[in-house]
């Protein structure tokens, strides 16, 4: 049996379902680039039939990602499969992933069909997908609660129809490791054509068993694991791929398998997903939490000083967690900035050097020394901006008193610069009143967070907001050494997204009115 475990990432599809506001195409592409650097074998980029935005995201990622196979999800319905194929056709290598429910409760109460009908639908879907590609994956939704005889029958039929990967999901996170591993073992024992497909698993974390179940499945013969970065996903989330990666690496002698991942990209990828998805990582999260490599007990510290192996089973460096790199200053040129970006593994097409260098100089003038983590924060924020942003903050002045604050701003509104001042309950409230008045948009804020993106008093701060406008949620991000400015950038990020959507809607309305 092959000893490589294929890593299938569904952060951009299953993971995104947990977010309050959907990721933009640009944000999804940033994450896809990071997954490609990490060495993920398959990236499930989205569900094309679900929305025009998802179709565009899959198509864009399929066009730009070269080293990972791009996958799109579809129900066992011809029009879904057609949409997936259309979005994926620009990819160098792609996979169509189709699925249908197999558990008794799903078949009877959701599909309201006989099991014979469901098997027939699955076979037709796989055969239809094979018209577009040889790489077809079929999933038995809620396999963890499917009667084993029915599951064996479905798997055999899907393989006969041409599926090259069979995915066994624990959709509601119901099983425990011995039980789930037993399901996989039974499939290998009872399905006669099982050797013609790779067995995959997709475990949810409702009972906190997703990672353990996935490892049990590998021990029983599964050779693909599906999951997400940081374990994000619906309800309690998905299997954490960074945990899977380091379990397989750390316990390779026991498990006898390996992955093709570049483990030193784990920390950076985790931070990016956390930042763009607006989902903080808990401090005690395995592998990537802030405390993952901390030792506060005196006994532990004494042991670590004598021999790190006493309490450390893996090193921070093994996941790419480094101390400060050589710093840059305002005297550093473009070549120095590019050299640092190259050393961190970023490709030229992942950022605009001129824009990054301009932001770098502003930051260097403010804080003197700029480190690699600062450059990354600047790059990610710059990638969220659009050159055609209608509103841009040109000037900000804040006066804070013991009770109220006054904020004055100059805001670029298209070709015109406008000025406004307001008094508020704190500088951010006053700034937001200025922006609301000048733009005409009044936004309902559902969530407001400030986080540090660097170290020390002069480190970058990131503001993240979830805003509600006309029933739709938007995510805005801002980065600056000044948290008030970062807060303003986050609100303008949202308002520019709304303004852009309103403009497109108005253009479509005018187009149809003239037809």
From Swiss-Prot:
Binding site for Mn(2+): 14, 202, 204, 238
GO cellular component entries: cytosol
Name under which the protein is recorded: 2-isopropylmalate synthase
EC number, as in UniProt: 2.3.3.13
Family from the record: Belongs to the alpha-IPM synthase/homocitrate synthase family. LeuA type 1 subfamily.
Pathways involved: Amino-acid biosynthesis; L-leucine biosynthesis; L-leucine from 3-methyl-2-oxobutanoate: step 1/4
Keywords, sorted A to Z: Amino-acid biosynthesis, Branched-chain amino acid biosynthesis, Cytoplasm, Leucine biosynthesis, Manganese, Metal-binding, Transferase
Cellular compartments annotated: Cytoplasm
Domain Pyruvate carboxyltransferase: 5-267
Record field: catalytic activity: 3-methyl-2-oxobutanoate + acetyl-CoA + H2O = (2S)-2-isopropylmalate + CoA + H(+)
């Amino acid at each position: 049996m092959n000893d490589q475990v294929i890593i299938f990432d569904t952060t951009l599809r299953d993971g995104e379902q947990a977010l309050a506001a959907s990721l933009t195409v640009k944000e999804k592409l940033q994450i896809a680039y990071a997954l490609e650097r990490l060495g993920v074998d398959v990236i499930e980029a989205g569900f094309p039939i679900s929305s025009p935005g998802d179709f565009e995201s899959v198509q864009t990622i399929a066009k730009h990602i070269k080293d990972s196979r791009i996958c799109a999800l579809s129900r066992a319905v011809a029009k879904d499969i057609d949409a997936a194929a259309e979005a994926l056709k620009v990819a160098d290598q792609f996979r169509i992933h189709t699925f249908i429910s197999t558990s008794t409760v799903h078949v009877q109460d959701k599909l309201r069909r006989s099991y014979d009908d469901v098997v027939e639908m699955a076979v037709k879907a796989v055969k239809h997908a094979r018209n577009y590609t040889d790489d077809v994956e079929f999933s038995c939704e809620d396999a963890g609660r499917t009667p084993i005889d029915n599951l064996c029958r479905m798997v055999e039929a899907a393989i006969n129809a041409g599926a090259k990967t069979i995915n066994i999901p624990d959709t509601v996170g119901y099983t425990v490791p011995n039980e789930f591993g037993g399901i996989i073992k039974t499939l290998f024992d009872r399905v006669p054509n099982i050797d013609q497909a790779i067995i995959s698993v997709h475990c949810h974390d409702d009972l906190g068993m997703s990672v353990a179940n996935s490892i049990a499945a590998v021990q029983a013969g599964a050779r693909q694991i599906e999951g997400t970065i940081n374990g994000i996903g619906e309800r309690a989330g998905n299997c954490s791929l960074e945990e899977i990666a380091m379990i397989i690496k750390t316990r390779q002698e026991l498990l006898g398998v390996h992955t093709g991942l570049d483990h030193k990209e784990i920390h950076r990828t985790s931070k990016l997903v956390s930042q763009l998805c607006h989902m903080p990582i808990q401090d005690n999260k395995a592998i990537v939490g802030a405390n993952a490599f901390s030792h506060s007990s005196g006994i532990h510290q004494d042991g670590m000083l004598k021999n790190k192996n006493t309490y450390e089973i893996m090193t921070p460096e093994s996941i790419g967690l480094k101390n400060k790199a050589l710093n840059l200053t305002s005297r550093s040129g473009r070549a120095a900035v590019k050299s640092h970006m190259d050393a961190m593994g970023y490709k030229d097409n992942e950022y605009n050097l001129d824009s990054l260098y301009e932001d770098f100089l502003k930051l260097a003038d403010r804080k003197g020394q700029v480190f690699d983590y600062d450059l990354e924060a600047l790059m990610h924020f710059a990638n969220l901006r659009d050159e055609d942003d209608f509103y841009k903050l040109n000037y900000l002045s804040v006066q804070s008193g013991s009770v109220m604050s006054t904020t004055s701003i100059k805001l670029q509104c298209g070709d015109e610069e406008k000025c406004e001042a307001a008094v508020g309950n704190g500088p951010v409230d006053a700034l937001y009143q200025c922006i609301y008045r000048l733009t005409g948009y009044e936004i309902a804020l559902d969530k407001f967070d400030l986080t540090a993106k660097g170290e020390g008093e002069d480190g970058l701060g990131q503001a993240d907001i979830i805003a509600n406008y006309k029933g739709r949620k938007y995510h805005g991000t801002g980065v600056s050494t000044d948290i008030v400015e970062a807060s303003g950038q986050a609100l303008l990020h949202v308002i520019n997204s709304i303004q852009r959507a309103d403009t497109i809607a108005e253009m479509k309305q005018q187009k149809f009115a003239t037809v």
